[in-house]
Each structure stands twice: as C-alpha cells, then as structure tokens.
C-alpha cells in the first residue's frame, strides 16, 4: 500500500513477476499503474507491506513515458554516461552502449543527437539505455503513448524479439487493451477506486506472437476479456 497526502491510499497491491514473464498493467487514470512500476523499481517506498526483488541492485531497467534524453549528448553518450556514473569504465560503458543501440536498431546512429531523432528513435535510445544495465527486470511506463500506430507496432515487435533473445522479465503499463493482450502473457487490471489488482488474466497463445495472431479468435476473446475487466474496474459504487 502507498499513501499520498490528500488522497486515498493506493492498494494493497499483490503482484508477483516470474522469470521471463511479460505482464501488462492496465487501469484508469489515477489507478496507480505508474506507482506500481515505481514501487517495483525501488523509486517509491510502500506505506505498508514490502517489495521483494530477487534481482541484484542495478539490474532493473526503466523506460519512462518520455525518453528524457540529454539534449546536448549524442545517442551513445545518452546510454553510456549513466553507466560510467554507476562505476563502469568508459570502455565498458561504450561497449554496452554500442551493443544496446544495435539491439534496438540504432547501431548506425550512435552520433545522432536527440533533435535529429524521430519520436520512435528517441524511445529506442531510452530502451537501449534500460537494456544497457543488462537487466533481469525491464519496466516500461506507457512507452508508446506518444507514438503513431505504425511506430508503436514496430516497437512492440522489437520488445518481443528482445525478450526472446534475453533472460528478462517485463512489466509494462498501457491504456491500450489490444496492446496489452498482444504483448503480454498476463494482464493485470487495477481498480479505479483504490488501485488494487482486481483481475489477473492469463493471455492465450505463445510468445512471441506468431504472424497473423491478431486475426486469431483467441486474440479477440482475450481483448474482450481485458476490456470487460477494465470496464468493471471503473465501477466506483461502494
């Protein structure tokens, strides 16, 4: 549970994340989705209860809704500098930065500055920065919210590809029901009333999704199940 002055407490929230799971967290505005990620990342402290993270400190990557890139720095520096500040040598930080940029399709743009990048490319740099810590857990707070549908779809496919290649669990926040059902193996719906998890829905089908899975009846049924749960979560009657 977490308390903010002047508003009702959020939670309690009981959420477990297994190795290599992909979990989507959906809910109305103010339900506590971003707060849940910040608790998992150790950026917030619960008023009661505990957050147990069986991963090493520094092994959690966080992708914020805004790329939050340093405007004066090129893509490589935006990824490498936080690593150097955490104690890595300049050579190792540069190696990880170049490898992470290549992993997100920007291996040919290490010298590009933020103003030279599209919104999708800037988000890829932010993703590369999160991957550069070689995380066991990757947290993504509505990373696609400001992007067009084509760019969003490309980044979703990239996340599936990266997940398949790495031993990483992912938890991401989204308002998009179809996005949640497609990307995740589980969808957790938070109550609009108090932020507790009201539904935890397993998604059918393999991950990564096979080509054409969006046309599968199981996908449509999963989308409807999440949409129904989200609608029910917004019932504010006592």
Where are these regions (language model features)?
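Conserved signature/switch motifs of ABC ATPase nucleotide-binding domains
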Residues: 112-115, 133
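Short coil-to-helix segment of the ABC ATPase nucleotide-binding domain corresponding to the Q-loop/switch region
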Residues: 73-80
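The feature captures the beta-strand-to-loop junction immediately N-terminal to the Walker
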Residues: 26-28
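Helix-to-loop junction immediately C-terminal to a conserved catalytic motif
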Residues: 41
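Catalytic Walker B motif of ABC-type/P-loop ATPase nucleotide-binding domains
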Residues: 138-141
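Conserved ABC ATPase "signature" region
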Residues: 84, 91-109, 161
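A short, flexible loop at the N-terminus of ABC-type nucleotide-binding domains that lies
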Residues: 1-12, 19
């Amino acid at each position: 549970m977490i308390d903010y002055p002047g508003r009702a407490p959020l939670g309690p929230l009981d959420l477990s994340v297994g190795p290599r799971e992909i979990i989507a967290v959906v809910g109305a505005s103010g339900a506590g989705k971003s707060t849940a990620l910040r608790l998992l990342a150790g950026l917030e402290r619960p008023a009661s209860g505990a957050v147990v993270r069986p991963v090493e400190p520094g092994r959690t990557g966080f992708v914020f809704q805004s790329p939050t890139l340093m405007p004066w720095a090129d893509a490589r520096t935006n990824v490498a500098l936080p690593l150097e500040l955490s104690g890595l040598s300049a050579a190792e930080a540069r190696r990880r930065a170049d490898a992470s940029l290549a992993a997100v399709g920007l291996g040919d743009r290490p010298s590009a500055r933020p103003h030279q990048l599209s919104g999708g490319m800037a988000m890829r740099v932010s993703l590369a920065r999160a991957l550069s810590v070689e995380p066991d857990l990757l947290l993504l707070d509505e990373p696609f919210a400001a992007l067009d549908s084509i760019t969003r779809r490309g980044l979703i496919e990239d996340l599936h590809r990266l997940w398949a290649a790495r031993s990483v669990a992912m938890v991401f926040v989204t308002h998009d029901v179809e996005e949640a059902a497609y990307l995740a193996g589980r969808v957790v719906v938070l109550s609009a009333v108090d932020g507790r998890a009201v539904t935890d829905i397993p998604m059918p089908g393999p991950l990564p999704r096979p080509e054409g899975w969006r046309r599968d009846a199981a996908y449509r049924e999963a989308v409807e199940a999440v949409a129904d749960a989200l609608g029910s979560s917004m019932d504010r009657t006592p």
